[in-house]
Amino acid sequence: LIDFDPSVFVERIDNPRDADYARGYRAYVFYGFRHSTAFELNPDNMYGVRPGTQVHDYFLPASERYGVVRDPEGTQYPALCRGQNPGDFNFFEASSIRQVGNKYVMVFSGYSGPDYGLSSTNSALRYAYGDTPLGPWRSGGVLVDSRGVVPNENGSHLTTTNFAHNTHGSLQQINGQWYVFYHRAPRGFGNARQPMVAPVKIECDKRSVAQGGKVRIVAYDPYAKNHEWTAAAADGNVYTGAEVTSEGFQIFGLNPYQKYSAGIACYVNGNNWMQDNFDNWDNNMDLAGITNCCVVCFKYFGFGGLAHDTK
């Protein structure tokens, strides 16, 4: 019954008035490739549908490309909030759910790009938020575009700094800081997947989603006054997803007096430079074939800022 790219969310039950209080939990599964499905798991076997509940087919709207829904014409989406445009979700695959405050955030691989002036790609993670693990949902937008979106040289429009292919990932809070985990495709080769992590800032108000409550997720910058980073261009396009950097968990900047693998470069203007490494115990990646006019960039190094590192 459970299909492609599944994830399971176990909801803790601590309300004595809840029918599942004695058991202490409810479990849900979410899955699907270009077709989103979800249901509550049978707690007696953890793989079938819980008796008395149903499979939620066409759970989130799936897209062919950004803004173009691929589900059959006339498909109804009872798991969406009233008035929510199905074309805003752009689901592709890789469902993953987290609880944030009093709300739930669904992360998935989805199509993005035209919403900030770039071509459509499924190299992005998107998110939706709701009051329960089964919604109803509102689209939150892009969480991270693994192509590394930045303004171009003169700031007239946004551009990309990595090659495109699909991604998978989710959110996790560590020592009070939220991070998005995802992967990018060195050389644009889908079977070569480099794990990535970036900090994000999450704002969640206490109102229910049905009453206008929201979850807002943007890139985190420890040095900005509002702790937010955005990529904005003169043409009016703005990307608010996580920033693709070389830092990993060193979010106050890399120590400039240490050695690092060339494979953590976050800006490359040519293909086929990053070389495969098939040694599971060697966490390095070589860059080769670099000639004149090649650009390879690393960001950021913490010159003078590491004394402020608290995370």
Question: Where are these predicted regions, by residue range?
Answer:
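Carbohydrate-active catalytic/glycan-binding domains of CAZyme proteins
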Residues: 1-308
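Extracellular ligand-binding interfaces
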Residues: 311
